[in-house]
Amino acid sequence: MNASTSAPPASDSTWSACSDDAVVPAEVRDAVDTVLGPSGLSRPEREILTTRIERWYPDLIDGLVTLYGDPAATRAAAEVLTEAAAAYVERDPELRHLDLARTLDPTWIQDPSRIGYAGYTERFAGDLRGVEKRIPYLRELGVSYLHLMPLLTPRPGDSDGGYAVADYRSVRPDLGDMDDLAHLTGELRKQNMSLVIDLVLNHVAAEHEWARRARAGEQRYRDYFFIYPDRAEPDEYEK
């Protein structure tokens, strides 16, 4: 194993002494360490993630065992947490700090003084840059929770109000782009405002990559969907 993918030495482990196989299996710890070891993150930064994994691993594995049984559940946990660790490494330090603050105060969202504002981007301000220009107005209203209705790229034409999403990784072109969205969230955070967007994940547009590949016959993607020989049963659901 080369240095770029090796786990940190045991002496530099950020797992707690009690994190034996009864809590987080060695297979999972090793998978996470393979990502964190060469990441360049400080020990405290790595320790924050491993502590969170130790805290929530029982909840994760319970759900995975229900779906896959053992030992497949442990392999799935290792895969999921490897991806989570990679995302954590790439995450903006400002957002990692926000994650920690919210972990320490899990009831933050239930604060009765929190004021929410929901609306459609195009009707409220034209586009995402327009929303950014209206932050002072939102601040004047006391808003701390801004919910922008569907703004991800939908299917062309009838898109169920924007909820038939063709691409979860891009913004509707008439509203801006992902850089505009990232900049808006940063400006909102400076005013202690949280941005919320809708992610409906139980269906996608027929134009979504997964749906296209399923129709093309790729079994992996066909397994993501309920597929019927004709419209008879789906039409019953829509009555």
Which residue ranges define each predicted feature?
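Acidic/aromatic-lined carbohydrate-recognition and catalytic surfaces
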Residues: 2-239
